[in-house]
Swiss-Prot record:
Native species: Cupriavidus necator (strain ATCC 17699 / DSM 428 / KCTC 22496 / NCIMB 10442 / H16 / Stanier 337)
Name of this chain's protein: Large ribosomal subunit protein bL12
GO cellular component: cytosolic large ribosomal subunit
Database matches in NCBIfam families: L12
Self-association state and partner proteins as the record states: Homodimer. Part of the ribosomal stalk of the 50S ribosomal subunit. Forms a multimeric L10(L12)X complex, where L10 forms an elongated spine to which 2 to 4 L12 dimers bind in a sequential fashion. Binds GTP-bound translation factors.
Length: 124
């Protein structure tokens, strides 16, 4: 006699959380799959446009230094906490990221400080 889908559902429904955990591990081992990988694979189909609208991490990029290089170096030091040499190297290497993975408010604040110093800034 073959086991039906309903029989399997009844058996799974009667299992405790620990038994279900063991069952999932057994499936992963037997079939060479991962329950986590399936969840990740389903996420991209959710819509890339919605993810772009809800961006939570931003990168502040120093695009151009402008005429006031000293002021920009001071602003970079204030924003990043870098030493004078490191800040100067960052400014000389523009375009370069000043801050990465910051929230929207921190990115806006950094952009304002750099623009007030005369730099051209991109937030991505």
């Amino acid at each position: 006699m073959a086991i039906t889908k309903d029989d399997i559902l009844e058996a799974v429904g009667a299992m405790s959380v620990m038994e279900l955990n063991d069952l999932v591990k057994a499936f992963e081992e037997k079939f060479g799959v991962s329950a986590a990988a399936m969840a990740v694979a389903a996420a991209p189909g959710a819509g890339g446009a919605a993810a772009a609208e809800e961006q939570t991490e931003f990168n502040v990029i120093l695009a151009e230094v402008g005429a006031n290089k000293v002021g920009v170096i001071k602003a970079v030091r204030e924003i990043t906490g870098l030493g004078l040499k490191e800040a100067k190297d960052l400014v000389d290497g523009a375009p370069k990221p000043v801050k990465e993975g910051v929230d929207k408010a921190a990115a806006a604040e950094a952009k304002k400080k750099l623009e007030d110093a005369g730099a051209k800034v991109d937030v991505k």
